[in-house]
């Protein structure tokens, strides 16, 4: 809708198990996806458990590359995505600007860059949040936060009905970036119109899964948003 044309070639940076890449090729037989990640073991798992479950014709339209996202050389893409906050591993302006410039160069002339970010007053706390699901409880643990540098270390734990636990199933160390910082860095890297998409609310005041452009946002305790930037 932003560009008034269909996109067919997507690159998923920090792709991990390539979930977004696989979903992209499912949506249209003309779609192709490239996934880039530096971790070979995670890519292997994705090949077996994500790509391997696609129809054979769809499998051929997903390519996984083991590489640092700043070094990889791919054909120009319509869309480049960096989700799950993984790009926050770049913990200085110099590193983040370098990545954004590389992302800008990797896009076609009318390409779009998508990333996500989270914030709110609770993002600056050392805390745990539990969410119950069928068969397990998901625990998001903000174990360490440094106000001076915005360094943070987080874990994901799982608890099960039989009393067993899987502690530190995932651990992340990154910088907590803010929305204005990301928008300014994107513009400095050459992107145009970096726009934050904010989630709407249902009648109970909870997120409704619908995101729309917003230039102010709400002072919520915790929020997740998307940023879209144009080349």
Spans of model-derived segments:
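Conserved SAM-binding strand-loop segment of SAM-dependent methyltransferases
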Residues: 54-69
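Conserved SAM-binding loop
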Residues: 46-47
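C-terminal lobe and adjacent flexible extensions of AdoMet/dcAdoMet transferase-like proteins
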Residues: 176-231
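A short acidic, Gly/Pro-enriched loop at the edge of an enzyme's catalytic core
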Residues: 70-80
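SAM-dependent methyltransferase
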Residues: 114-185
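Conserved SAM-binding loop of SAM-dependent methyltransferases across substrates and taxa
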Residues: 17-30
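A short glycine-rich, Lys/Arg-flanked "PGG" loop and its adjoining helix->strand segment in the class I
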Residues: 96-109
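Conserved class I S-adenosyl-L-methionine
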Residues: 6-16
């Amino acid at each position: 809708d932003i560009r008034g044309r269909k996109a067919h070639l997507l690159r998923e940076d920090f792709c991990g198990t390539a979930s977004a890449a696989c979903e992209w090729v499912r949506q249209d037989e003309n779609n192709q996806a490239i996934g880039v990640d530096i971790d070979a073991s995670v890519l292997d798992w994705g090949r077996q458990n994500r790509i391997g479950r696609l129809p054979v014709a769809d499998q051929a339209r997903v390519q996984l590359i083991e590489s640092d996202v700043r070094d990889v050389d791919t054909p120009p893409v319509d869309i480049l995505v960096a989700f799950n906050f993984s790009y926050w591993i770049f913990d200085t302006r110099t590193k983040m600007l370098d990545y954004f410039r590389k992302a800008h160069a990797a896009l076609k002339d009318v390409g779009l860059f998508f990333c996500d970010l989270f914030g709110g007053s609770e993002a600056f706390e050392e805390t745990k949040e539990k969410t119950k699901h069928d068969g397990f409880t998901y625990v998001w643990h903000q174990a360490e936060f440094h106000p001076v540098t915005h360094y943070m270390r987080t874990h994901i734990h799982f608890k099960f009905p039989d009393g067993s636990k899987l502690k530190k199933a995932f651990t992340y160390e990154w910088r907590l970036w803010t929305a204005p910082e990301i928008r300014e860095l994107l513009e400095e890297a050459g992107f145009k119109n970096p726009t934050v998409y904010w989630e709407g609310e249902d009648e109970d005041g909870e997120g409704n899964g619908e995101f729309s452009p917003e230039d102010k946002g709400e002072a919520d305790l915790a929020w997740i948003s998307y940023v879209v930037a144009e080349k």
